[in-house]
Curated annotation (Swiss-Prot):
The modification Phosphothreonine is found at residue 133. GO terms for biological process: embryonic development via the syncytial blastoderm. Residues 106-120 have a biased composition (Basic residues). Residues 142-155 have a biased composition (Polar residues). The modification Phosphoserine is found at residues 86, 134. This is Protein a6. It comes from the Eukaryota. Keywords: Phosphoprotein. Residues 106-165 are annotated as: Disordered. The keyword Phosphoprotein applies. The keyword Nucleotidyltransferase does not apply.
């Protein structure tokens, strides 16, 4: 028997690559992974449910403890004139009991599902009181049955001006800024859009607490209340009023400090301590004899700037302080000196003397005056002591080198 053999062949490893078996194995692996993901998700849900149940139980315990507390808190309103409400024992002695929850011991669970047990609370006598101090001298004592605490933040009016003779008196200014989100216009818009008025929580988040209305229609929650003393309550329609009041207050303080320093330095115009209110009480004849407290205003407007350390700077609205005209570089005797210029020179010399005597008051005078019939402004800066006093004309002609300042407007 003649047996034929084929040509030699090679066994490829791909013969053992069963594709159907591989696909079947991949399907089983996918099902196993899906089942594992489902089991893990169920376990996570069970853990979250258990923690949520614990949180609910603790929340119920806290609510139960809070509901069992009795509102037995003493509030004493203390004023400057301490008037005892009763001649016997004080009011705080009768209300010295406050309930404090004791930590309840949680019982061990016997089964998986168990009804939430209510925590046991115990009360302990604890002496506790809240003291609220008031700066108002005319504090009306309300009866204890109708005593009602209002949570309101009021802006205190600044203290009055100190007299000119006491230079060591410390001036204190309380500045309260009104945010734009709590103005009357926004409150009115909010009221017109919604039936309920502005609540105290919305205003308190902006830095103010509105006063609660009294009965029915007396709703003043949309207006900002300002405590100006003496039981007078004013409403601020906008923050511009507050900024104006602050600016006027700073201006009055700076003027009083300037007058006080000039009077202390020995300027004859400022030695008398007559205030504008006292000048108004005088007759016109005596008022004409008394020298004015403030120098006459020059033709060029002067701005008054007050920094944080009460340093006063008189800044002209004109940008250039050095004049290039021939009147400054030339002789002084060519043109007649204007009386306002003479007054400015005296004021400048007084300011420099004040700077030497009281270094804590930083007075910088940077003025521009228009002389009589002069088109160009005259930059006037007279140093108190000249290095080489050879000629007074050179001293007057050379202006003082002051740091350039920007406009305030």
């Amino acid at each position: 028997m003649n047996q034929k053999h084929s040509e030699p062949f090679y066994i490829s490893p791909r013969l053992f690559d069963n594709r159907r078996l591989k696909r079947r194995r991949c399907r089983w692996m996918e099902r196993l992974l899906e089942h594992q993901r489902i089991c893990m998700a169920r376990m996570r849900d069970q853990v979250a449910l258990a923690s949520k149940t614990d949180r609910q139980l603790s929340h119920l315990q806290r609510r139960h403890v809070a509901s069992t507390l009795q509102p037995d808190v003493t509030i004493d309103l203390l004023s400057d004139d301490d008037e005892t409400p009763s001649a016997g024992q004080p009011a705080a002695a009768g209300h010295n009991r406050l309930l404090i929850p004791a930590p309840g011991h949680r019982a061990h669970r016997t089964g998986r599902r168990q009804a939430p047990r209510r925590a046991a609370t115990h009360s302990y006598p604890v002496t506790d009181s809240i003291l609220i101090t008031s700066d108002d001298e005319h504090n009306e004592q309300e009866p204890s049955s109708t005593a009602r605490v209002r949570s309101q933040l009021s802006m205190r009016s600044p203290p009055p001006l100190a007299p000119l003779t006491q230079s060591e008196t410390i001036e204190e200014v309380t500045v309260s800024l009104v945010p734009r989100t709590s103005t009357t216009a926004n409150c009115l818009t909010r009221v017109s859009g919604h039936p309920k008025p502005c609540r105290a929580s919305t205003a308190a988040s902006n830095g103010f607490a509105t006063a609660e209305g009294g009965e029915g229609g007396n709703e003043t929650g949309c207006f900002l209340e300002v405590d100006v003393g003496g039981g007078i309550t004013a409403t601020l329609p906008d923050e511009t009023t507050v900024h104006t009041v602050i600016a006027n207050r700073i201006y009055e303080l700076s003027l009083s400090k300037l007058r006080e320093g000039l009077a202390f330095s020995g300027v004859p115009e400022y030695t008398n301590d007559l205030m504008p209110e006292q000048l108004q009480k005088l007759s016109p004849a005596l008022r004409a004899k008394v020298a004015p407290l403030v120098a006459p205003s020059p033709p060029t407007p002067i701005s008054l700037k007050l920094s944080s350390d009460l340093s006063i700077s008189l800044i002209s609205d004109e940008d250039d302080c050095e004049s290039t005209g021939p009147h400054v570089n030339g002789g002084v005797g060519t043109e007649p000196v204007h009386p306002v210029v003479v007054a400015a020179a005296e004021a400048h010399a007084a300011a420099k003397l004040l700077k030497q005597q009281q270094p804590q008051l930083s007075v910088v005078q940077h003025l521009q005056y228009v002389g009589g019939g002069l088109a160009a402004p005259v930059a006037l800066a007279l140093p108190v002591m000249a290095a080489n006093p050879t000629s007074s004309a050179s001293v007057v002609a050379l202006p003082l080198q002051l740091p350039r300042r920007r406009k305030l407007g």
